[in-house]
């Protein structure tokens, strides 16, 4: 009897040691723990929201990486927010918005997660972190400005609109090495169309003022002009055994309506906000003390 009792105790002890060997903490962010329960709940939630029933070992590894990353990012955002609470109304509205997007009745999303044995707290926690992120983006948007020059460059690069170009084209009088050197020196002195004096080039070159649509300018020159901003001179290039420089005086984009302009402004604004946010989140991660204790 004593021997049997000893075996039972030994087995019980071994079982408890095995259980204890499972890491209850799977990661920490600035010494704040992420628990095994949180990790498992997040994996379950991701599977439920994507209607995934089973996984291969490789897919499970990908899911684990995704879950731990989302929990780490979430922890960083909560630490950034500090004591600032997310109002319940904002959380409810965010959930309703997701339900509307997926054509679900209001109140059914959390019920669906519960039916899949998913802890709704994990989902709500992610909603809160996304709302914190949106508040950060909103704050960053107030420091973002888009210049008219940036708008013009974006529209030009789209090749959707024609452009009226005014430019000064300087052509050397001959094609020798001396002419090439003189044209290079001229290029370095060309700053603004309004400041160009005949004495700058008259001994070795001619100058022609051209105003035309970009689409009507011949191939090589069109490519050169397209990449130049106003009051910017091109490098010296060769045409018909002579050397040329183009100095763009102005660019006027034709037939852009208000809606198109606003679309470009919004696109550039969102791009700048996204870049600022990405840099901010990267700095958060770099400065944070992050430890992951998941087995590789």
From Swiss-Prot:
SUPFAM superfamilies found in the cross-reference section: Triger factor/SurA peptide-binding domain-like
Source domain of life: Bacteria
Pfam families registered for this protein in UniProt: SurA_N_3
Signal peptide positions on this chain: 1-20
UniProt entry keywords in alphabetical sequence: Signal
Transmembrane segments: none
Record InterPro entries: OMP_Chaperone_SurA, Trigger_fact/SurA_dom_sf
Protein name as it appears in the record: Uncharacterized protein RF_0255
Organism for this UniProt entry: Rickettsia felis (strain ATCC VR-1525 / URRWXCal2) (Rickettsia azadi)
